[in-house]
């Protein structure tokens, strides 16, 4: 999809936009989402980050999925100046100056950090949000020393990108996500995160993410996927947590899985 394709769809008289889920938890599926809810999501993100009219934003994600579409909507709704580049593993290549706001996936961030000029630009982006999958602990450790505001996002297509952010850089770096205003979270019987975000999602959403909610009843952190739980001797073990503990002692790529 081109930028013109999406802006034409956005400006037509239909109240909804067609999006597709990423397929990370199954086969990608089409989904109709309301433009008014996309506008609400855009305003919430811009308000949380303190973005203002005239700030520059970078579109380096495919417009076939919600992450790219929402960058355009944020620019249209909040008056951001949007710069577009072809989606690639090196989104900052060829740019003369850093945007105020950008959204990337972990691989784009990692690749940019390997090139001196791109790494310098990456450190100058005032607000960098990273979504589309979990980054490595090594990447997080490097980002912690960045002078700008780097955030990990939590959300999915059904929540119109993200409903919570957590800081990855600076003294405020944390494992705990902070939900946006109006978003409530809880756990179901299996310990999976339940999201109530009426501004962006009409129905309460039960995820497959095993989570922990802080004592304030608001902040939360993700332990791993429900289908990555191993029951050993009556004790439930989260594969992602085991991998995180072992990673400093293993000098190669590895994974832990259930015994067939």
Segments predicted by a language model, with ranges:
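Conserved pre-ATP/AMP-binding loop-to-beta segment of ANL
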Residues: 3-20, 53-56
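Conserved AMP-binding A3 loop
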Residues: 16-43, 50-52
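Conserved S/T- and glycine-rich ATP-binding loop of Class I adenylate-forming
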Residues: 21-24, 57, 72, 102-103, ...
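Active-site glycine-centered loops adjacent to acidic/histidine catalytic or metal-binding residues
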Residues: 24, 132, 155, 209, ...
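AMP-binding/adenylate-forming
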Residues: 33-40, 56-111
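Gly/Ser/Thr-rich phosphate-binding loop
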Residues: 115-170
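Conserved ATP-binding loop and adjacent catalytic segment of the adenylate-forming AMP-binding
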Residues: 148-190, 197-204
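AMP-binding/adenylate-forming catalytic core of the ANL superfamily
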Residues: 208-260
């Amino acid at each position: 999809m081109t930028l013109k394709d999406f802006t034409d769809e956005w400006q037509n008289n239909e109240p909804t936009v067609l999006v597709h889920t990423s397929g990370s938890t199954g086969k990608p599926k089409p989904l109709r989402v309301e433009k008014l809810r996309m506008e609400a999501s855009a305003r919430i993100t811009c308000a949380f980050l303190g973005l203002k009219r005239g700030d520059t934003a970078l579109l380096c994600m495919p417009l076939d999925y919600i992450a790219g579409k929402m960058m355009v909507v944020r620019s249209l709704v909040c008056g951001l100046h949007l710069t577009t580049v072809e989606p690639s593993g090196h989104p900052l290549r060829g740019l003369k100056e850093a945007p105020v706001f950008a959204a990337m996936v972990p691989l784009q961030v990692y690749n940019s950090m390997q090139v001196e000029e791109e790494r310098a630009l990456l450190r100058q982006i005032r607000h960098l949000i990273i979504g589309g999958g979990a980054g490595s602990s090594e990447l997080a450790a490097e980002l912690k020393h960045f002078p700008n505001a780097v955030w990990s996002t939590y959300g999915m297509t059904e929540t119109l990108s993200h409903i919570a952010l957590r800081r990855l850089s600076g003294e405020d770096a944390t494992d705990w996500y902070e939900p946006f205003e109006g978003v409530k979270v809880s756990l179901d019987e299996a310990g999976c995160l339940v999201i109530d975000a009426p501004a962006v999602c009409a129905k309460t959403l039960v995820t497959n993410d095993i989570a922990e909610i802080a004592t304030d009843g608001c902040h939360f952190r993700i332990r791993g996927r429900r289908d990555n739980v191993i029951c050993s001797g009556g004790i439930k073990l989260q594969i992602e947590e085991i991998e995180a503990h072992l990673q400093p002692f293993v000098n190669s790529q590895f994974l832990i899985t259930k015994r067939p």
